[in-house]
Each structure stands twice: as structure tokens, then as C-alpha cells.
């Protein structure tokens, strides 16, 4: 049995925007909350957060530090490192969960809010991971303004590249699609031409980074270089859903253009409730395309739903006690 320090109304798994927003909301609702944070936020490589009203341009690490301080200020508890890494979670007969952590500790939770995020799996091109979030990009709403009017290249690994090229064309009139492992057909080329996007054939084998530590070009297999200051890629989204699959909730697949581009956890879009009673999900683990502001909003909505669920359970328990019902 977990001791008093290891018992919480709600355990929040994940200390990013969704998890901390949920923890803050629950703590302000006078719930005992424990955040388990392994310390690997999705946007760690990025220098700034954009599109978050009141926080545009904030450093991601500093934004999370402020969020932790706010949640702690209302009584939430936060564990990081091994103590914040969830190894497994098991349902307890009669209600609640036992959450096992990397340091060997066990936490008893009445409800779970899973906000573990996802992993971005990049195409296997040398150098991409080192530049990810800097000048190897995915979301124009996160980074488009910073590379506006610069020469941009889109790494084509599937039909989604046509959509990406047309979208990024909003921020620059110098967009090139590179037929890396997928070449557009006649209809796609017509669409690209209508948007003013050039198509260059050839597999990308590397990146050329200038002395200013900025991307200067991509290198093709035949030795040609294509100048660009940012490279747009389509990562595969892999949900960090181990704690949920361990409880029996399978992953769902994400499809774009008839192709599977990742995995996520299904949850109610309004409340975050999953098919598992007592378990909610918020943020990129359930909505891979969500930005920081949206992930935080999901955390708040899930927290409200969890608090409501706890109130209903407490009311039922009080009714049974008043009637002298057993159990």
C-alpha cells in the first residue's frame, strides 16, 4: 500500500503544457495532484514558443519552469527524473490505480491524466536530428514567420509533401519540393506549379551547414546542392502511450493521404476521457498536431472533467453512507 506521500486524487503523467495546465487547474480545485515528469518535452529543441497569446516568443524551458512554479504554488507536487518516470500502471480492484515509477516508488491515484506527448521520428537523412526545431521544421504556424521570404525546401517522403509545399508557400515565394523518396504525379505537379513551387528530382543525402551554424543547402545523391535556409519534413508521430497500452487501451493510427503517419490515443475531444474508466488524456499524445496553446487548453478541459467525475463519485459515496448501504 502506498504511504501518504504517495497518494493523490489525480496523478498527471507528463509535465509539458497539457500536464501542467491540468495540474494547475486541479490544484486550484483543491485536489491533491502529483505530476510525474520524465523531463523530455517534445519542443525541447526549439528556441521559442509561438502563437501562445501572452507568451509569444517565450523560451520553452522557461515557460515550463513558470508553469511548474504556478502549479506548485497551489499545492501540486512534481517529481522528475527516475521518480517521475512511469514504468507501469495497474488498476486497483475497487477503484483507482497503482503507478510504478523508475525509482521503485509506487503511487496510489484515484484518477489518471496522461499527457505524455509524442516522439517525432524523422526521415533517415544524416544531420536532420541535429537541426530539428531550428531549420529542419514541420509546422509553419510555429516557425513560418521566422523563415519568411527565405528559400525553403520540402523533403518529399509521401503525398503529404504536396500539401506541405502549398502551405509553406504562404510564408515564402521560394519553395522547392525535393522528390526524396516520393515523386509527385502529373496532377500533383499541376497543383505545385499553380502555387509557384518548383520540383527538383533527386534523393537527399545530407545537409550543408554554413559557418554561421545555419542551414545553407541540401546535398543530393548526384552531388548537386539545392540552396535553402530551412528544410520542411514530415515526421512520423509516435505517441508515448506505454502507460495506456499497459492498461489495455490500444493505440490508434493516424492517416494522411491514405498513408499511416503515426499513432495516437483516442479520447473524447471535449473532455479528454478515454475508453478506460478513470483515465483521461490531453496534449500531443491524443492530438499530435496540437500546438502548445491547444495542448494547455486540452489539459484544462480534462482537469475540469476529472474534478467533476470525482465530485460525482464523492456524492454517490456520501449517499450510500447516509443510507447505511454497504460498499
PLM regions: where:
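FAD-site-proximal beta/loop scaffold in flavoenzymes
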Residues: 130-146, 237-291
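A conserved FAD-binding loop/helix module that cradles the flavin
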Residues: 22-24, 162-164, 282-327
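Glycine-rich dinucleotide-binding loop and its adjacent helix/turn
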Residues: 121-166
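Beta1-alpha1 glycine-rich phosphate/pyrophosphate-binding loop at the start
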Residues: 3, 8-65, 150-151, 160-182
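Solvent-exposed alpha-helices and their adjacent loops that cap or buttress functional pockets
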Residues: 2-5, 92, 104-106, 129-131, ...
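Phosphate-coordination loops involved in phosphoryl transfer and adenosine-cofactor binding
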Residues: 7-9, 81, 148-149, 276
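A Rossmann-like FAD-binding core segment of flavoenzymes
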Residues: 65-66, 71-101, 106-109, 172-263, ...
Amino acid at each position: 500500500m502506498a504511504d501518504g506521500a504517495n497518494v493523490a486524487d489525480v496523478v498527471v503523467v507528463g509535465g509539458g503544457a497539457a500536464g501542467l495546465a491540468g495540474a494547475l487547474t486541479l490544484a486550484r480545485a483543491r485536489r491533491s495532484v502529483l505530476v510525474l515528469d520524465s523531463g523530455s518535452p517534445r519542443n525541447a529543441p526549439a528556441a521559442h514558443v509561438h502563437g501562445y497569446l501572452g507568451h509569444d516568443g517565450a523560451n520553452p524551458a522557461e515557460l515550463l519552469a513558470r508553469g511548474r512554479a504556478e502549479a506548485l504554488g497551489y499545492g501540486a507536487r512534481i517529481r522528475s527524473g527516475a521518480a517521475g518516470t512511469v514504468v507501469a500502471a495497474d488498476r486497483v480492484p475497487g477503484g483507482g490505480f497503482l503507478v510504478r515509477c523508475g525509482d521503485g516508488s509506487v503511487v496510489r491515484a484515484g484518477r489518471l491524466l496522461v499527457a505524455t506527448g509524442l516522439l517525432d521520428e524523422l526521415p533517415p537523412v544524416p544531420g536532420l536530428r541535429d537541426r530539428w526545431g531550428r531549420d529542419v521544421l514541420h509546422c509553419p504556424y510555429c516557425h513560418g514567420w521566422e523563415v519568411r521570404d527565405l528559400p525553403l525546401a520540402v523533403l518529399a517522403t509521401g503525398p503529404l509533401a504536396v500539401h506541405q509545399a502549398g502551405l509553406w508557400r504562404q510564408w515564402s515565394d521560394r519553395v522547392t519540393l525535393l522528390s526524396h523518396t516520393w515523386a509527385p504525379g502529373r496532377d500533383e505537379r499541376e497543383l505545385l506549379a499553380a502555387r509557384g513551387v518548383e520540383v527538383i528530382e533527386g534523393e537527399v543525402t545530407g545537409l550543408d551547414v554554413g559557418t554561421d551554424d545555419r542551414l545553407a543547402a541540401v546535398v543530393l545523391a548526384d552531388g548537386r546542392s539545392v540552396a535553402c535556409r530551412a528544410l520542411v519534413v514530415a515526421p512520423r508521430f509516435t505517441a508515448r502511450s506505454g502507460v495506456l497500452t499497459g492498461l489495455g487501451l490500444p493505440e490508434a493510427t493516424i492517416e494522411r493521404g491514405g498513408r499511416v503517419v503515426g499513432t495516437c490515443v483516442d479520447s473524447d475531444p471535449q473532455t479528454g476521457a478515454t475508453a478506460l474508466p478513470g483515465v483521461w488524456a490531453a496534449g500531443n499524445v491524443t492530438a499530435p498536431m496540437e500546438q502548445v496553446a491547444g495542448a494547455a487548453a486540452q489539459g484544462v478541459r480534462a482537469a475540469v472533467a476529472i474534478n467533476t467525475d470525482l465530485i460525482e463519485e464523492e456524492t454517490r459515496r456520501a449517499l450510500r453512507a447516509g443510507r447505511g448501504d454497504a460498499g
